Amino acid sequence: MREDRSMKKYIFPIIAIVLGCSSCDSFLEKTPKDRLVPETYFKTENDLKMFSNSFYDNLLDKTPYDEQSDVMFEKGTISDELLGGTAREVPQAAASGGWSWGQLRKINTMLGHMDQCTDAEVAKQYTGLAKFFRTQFYFQKVMRFGDVPWYDKELGSRDSSLYKARDSRELVMSNMLNDIDDAIESLPSGKSVYRVNKWAALMLKAQFCLYEGTFRKYHNVTLPGHSAEDYLKLAYQAAEQVMNSGVYSLASDYHELFREPDADQNEYILAIRMEQSIGCTHSATSYVAMNTGGNPGFSKKFIDSFLMKDGTRYTDKPDWETKLFVEEVADRDPRLGMIIRLPQSIRVNSKKTIYGPELTMTSTGFQLEKFVMDPQYETAERANMSFNDIPVYRLGEAYLMFAEAKAELNILTQEDVDNSINKLRDRVGMPHLVLAGLTVDPFLTSETYGYQNLAKLNPSNLAQILEVRRERTIEMALEGRRWNDIVRWKEGATWTEPLYGMYFPGPGAYDLTGDGNADVYLYATAKVDNAVKKQYGDNFTYLQIQEIEIDGKYVPYSDGIILSEGTKGFVAMHYKKARAFDESRDYLYPIPSGDRQLNPNLAQNNGWADGLDF
């Protein structure tokens, strides 16, 4: 399951790190809760700060990778969510699979004792902080499970409310709106990249309102209270406040923004701080640069969505699907070369100089570059040793949420685009998005690669919505948004689209660096021909094109490569893995059967069979 895999695998060993790494020595570790007497605590700012440090732990699911999505996946395995069907099961253990509530109990405990604080202004600020985290906690729960029980006070072990049914989605969302508005009013407005402030609260509001507005729109959900349009309006208004605050500005270099050790305090609104000296690290670089790191790669679909640097569509070119790598990535949106390794990419460390992508280190040939630290920080290439800060919210996302909410309401103007998306394009030297004369991109609506649900709905401003989605997918790549974007847009069919990579027309030598010399040789025989080895030498990359099936049995790769059409086609390491998506079931996760046994009033989400008949 996504929540269980994410930070354990990609961020750092299981230590209690929070923003600023403060929980490494937090009060909650020094003083276990069974020795904390609430009635005599929560009196000073230091009490509140130390207790609330652990709230930041909940931000740690903000991974630097979309490790299960249609745009990026690993070489050896793909997630249960991408496999779908019987690969997805109802968890049995109580409090597993994301159905855990300990963090909420801590938040409600502090709120319940806030009147003990002797400083009214401090109490107001920390009330706002707690309500921010309660909103964030419930946002994660609603995205994962839909209806959930709402609790706004600490409950005793015998309280009957522990066994109540799930509350309606609208009740929970309305309470979240009340909480986040209190947080916006109460939190400080100064920059504090490692601590929650007013602007982080506005980003959270924009984020969950955009999610809810689009979820209700595309899933056709109508509930008493707020409408989809209400949430979309709240989303763009919150994002606009951040945009117009004058507090933040875009960093000048998109590439460096994600690989510098310290968070850019102009663009980053809230970040997870990493500190190598005390072991607060993650594995973004080693995940890409080591054989044991997962060997992730971007899908061809993602690469093909990038425009040419002159603003025209790559997929309008003749034979676009079967162009070789060097030609395929030439003259594209400059962000492509900041997100993947291009032919001219050079990486130097103490062991070797690496040119272009390393085909053996990626599932598709399209090797990740974003979040990979500069080679000068060589220790980052060791397992779990990257120390560049991870963004939670940044100004670039505010621009995208603003534009998307307005597009979904069909009120997006050229002025809106110039104040949002075109600022992101200006940063990398891309031509502006111009709404006048905009036409639908067939690639983005195709059955093979496109948004099929949106294409069927065919709204009057289809072209606008598609271009906003293109921009979001590119700009926010690897920032942990893609899965939930697909859910809220009701585009689950994209998870069954082909997981393809680079195209190779057959065995032979291929240039991946654009210098006219071969870098890799693909062969479809039992071993490399001696004449070929003599020509290219031993210090060269040879990859066997492996048979997908032999005598009716699927043969997995070892050090070879699988192509979609046998000895030619797209890199397709997961070609024979059956994948499915159940539109009636898979947009929500199941509640663990153990929790339903403890509380029979909890109804199971539709389509999830757990063997419990009540």
Where are these regions (language model features)?
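C-terminal motif of bacterial Sec signal peptides marking the signal peptidase cleavage site
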Residues: 21-23
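An aromatic- and glycine-enriched ligand-binding surface/loop that stacks and positions planar moieties
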Residues: 25-82, 173, 181-182, 195-202, ...
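Conserved, well-structured interaction surfaces
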Residues: 45-53, 57-61, 79-145, 160-195, ...
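Long, intrinsically disordered, low-complexity segments
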Residues: 100-101, 175, 259-307, 425, ...
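Short coil/turn linking the two alpha-helices of tandem helical-hairpin repeats
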Residues: 142-144, 149, 191, 211-220, ...
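C-terminal substrate/ligand-recognition segments
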Residues: 329, 333-427, 578, 583-614
